[in-house]
């Protein structure tokens, strides 16, 4: 039992050089918790509001108003509360905000405080964060979704699909999975370079070559997997994030890079064709965020054999997830803590998904920091999958390195999710 005696918010920079919120929480026993808040590039319309200052400073992206909320109204409301009362503290902040999307105080302000309090309480108890949040049952190391080719909003190239990922399901451990991913990543770099493509990386550490189509990108990845000594569709599978809301307008999916304009039925056919050709086991945001009929059609068509992940569709929001479950839409939720804006609501969304036999994928954002909280959350929730970028950029590797440490701490009790994540 330790009361909150001080909360300090500050403005720091994320991996894109934009301001974000960092919060320190100090407890009366001297324990300190620190958390930094991530930020997305392709954001769903239904996400909680990330409060930005506007004006000329930092081109409008400053977060001094959110910092003022942390140091002022939020501290006034929860200062003196016991840090072990996470749910009560989060609900107090949500009530203080008074809006459905946290647009008053800002989800970035509330989340920073929420996560820092959990870290402070874990420190007070002398427990690692994953153990404090997940209890004794927290032991599953997640299969990484490693984003090795970037397109869409994450890169300056003509590829429509935002992320091409590999999932090393046959690894014997998390550390082994990271090694396999690294080997494929470096093999892919050599293949791209030998074909005359640039090997610059995008926001999430994946390569951003000037490729002509989705299938060309997949072809390079398949070749890299094989040249690294692995078998696609056995050792390593593919996963895609279409971020299709970004190219959906007036009922049409406009794949500019490929010169295709498709209605919902055509988009479903497009995905079914790709899944038939390649070992793709997961597609995120295959349909636009409010194309519920398209999502239902996609789920009915390939949902029995492919993980269909709702990111912009669900935005880590229980109400939208409940709608999706009731409609039989998608079969998985992407979990981004800043989409909903508090630890309590994040954990509630994961619990709802699991109760409905939906999978959950813990995820970073394209604008990240050295904060590795999501690694602990992935293990705490036993969600079995994590999406945290490529094998480049320290803001991405911070999460993989933390998972390696957690696996070491768990010892023989730890279990790598591996092929248990496969459908069908």
Curated annotation (Swiss-Prot):
<feature type="binding site">
    <location>
        <position position="241"/>
    </location>
    <ligand>
        <name>Mg(2+)</name>
    </ligand>
</feature>
<keyword id="KW-0963">Cytoplasm</keyword>
<dbReference type="GO" id="GO:0000287">
    <property type="term" value="F:magnesium ion binding"/>
</dbReference>
<keyword id="KW-0479">Metal-binding</keyword>
<dbReference type="GO" id="GO:0009986">
    <property type="term" value="C:cell surface"/>
</dbReference>
<comment type="similarity">
    <text>Belongs to the enolase family.</text>
</comment>
<dbReference type="InterPro" id="IPR029017">
    <property type="entry name" value="Enolase-like_N"/>
</dbReference>
<dbReference type="InterPro" id="IPR000941">
    <property type="entry name" value="Enolase"/>
</dbReference>
<dbReference type="InterPro" id="IPR020809">
    <property type="entry name" value="Enolase_CS"/>
</dbReference>
<feature type="binding site">
    <location>
        <position position="336"/>
    </location>
    <ligand>
        <name>(2R)-2-phosphoglycerate</name>
    </ligand>
</feature>
<dbReference type="Pfam" id="PF00113">
    <property type="entry name" value="Enolase_C"/>
</dbReference>
<dbReference type="GO" id="GO:0006096">
    <property type="term" value="P:glycolytic process"/>
</dbReference>
<comment type="pathway">
    <text>Carbohydrate degradation; glycolysis; pyruvate from D-glyceraldehyde 3-phosphate: step 4/5.</text>
</comment>
<feature type="active site" description="Proton acceptor">
    <location>
        <position position="336"/>
    </location>
</feature>
<comment type="function">
    <text>Catalyzes the reversible conversion of 2-phosphoglycerate (2-PG) into phosphoenolpyruvate (PEP). It is essential for the degradation of carbohydrates via glycolysis.</text>
</comment>
<dbReference type="InterPro" id="IPR020810">
    <property type="entry name" value="Enolase_C"/>
</dbReference>
<feature type="binding site">
    <location>
        <position position="366"/>
    </location>
    <ligand>
        <name>(2R)-2-phosphoglycerate</name>
    </ligand>
</feature>
<dbReference type="InterPro" id="IPR036849">
    <property type="entry name" value="Enolase-like_C_sf"/>
</dbReference>
<dbReference type="GO" id="GO:0004634">
    <property type="term" value="F:phosphopyruvate hydratase activity"/>
</dbReference>
<dbReference type="Pfam" id="PF03952">
    <property type="entry name" value="Enolase_N"/>
</dbReference>
<dbReference type="GO" id="GO:0005576">
    <property type="term" value="C:extracellular region"/>
</dbReference>
<feature type="binding site">
    <location>
        <position position="162"/>
    </location>
    <ligand>
        <name>(2R)-2-phosphoglycerate</name>
    </ligand>
</feature>
<feature type="binding site">
    <location>
        <position position="311"/>
    </location>
    <ligand>
        <name>Mg(2+)</name>
    </ligand>
</feature>
<feature type="binding site">
    <location>
        <position position="387"/>
    </location>
    <ligand>
        <name>(2R)-2-phosphoglycerate</name>
    </ligand>
</feature>
<keyword id="KW-0456">Lyase</keyword>
<feature type="active site" description="Proton donor">
    <location>
        <position position="204"/>
    </location>
</feature>
<feature type="binding site">
    <location>
        <position position="284"/>
    </location>
    <ligand>
        <name>Mg(2+)</name>
    </ligand>
</feature>
<dbReference type="InterPro" id="IPR020811">
    <property type="entry name" value="Enolase_N"/>
</dbReference>
<keyword id="KW-0964">Secreted</keyword>
<dbReference type="GO" id="GO:0000015">
    <property type="term" value="C:phosphopyruvate hydratase complex"/>
</dbReference>
<keyword id="KW-0324">Glycolysis</keyword>
<keyword id="KW-0460">Magnesium</keyword>
<feature type="binding site">
    <location>
        <position position="365"/>
    </location>
    <ligand>
        <name>(2R)-2-phosphoglycerate</name>
    </ligand>
</feature>
<protein>
    <recommendedName>
        <fullName>Enolase</fullName>
        <ecNumber>4.2.1.11</ecNumber>
    </recommendedName>
</protein>
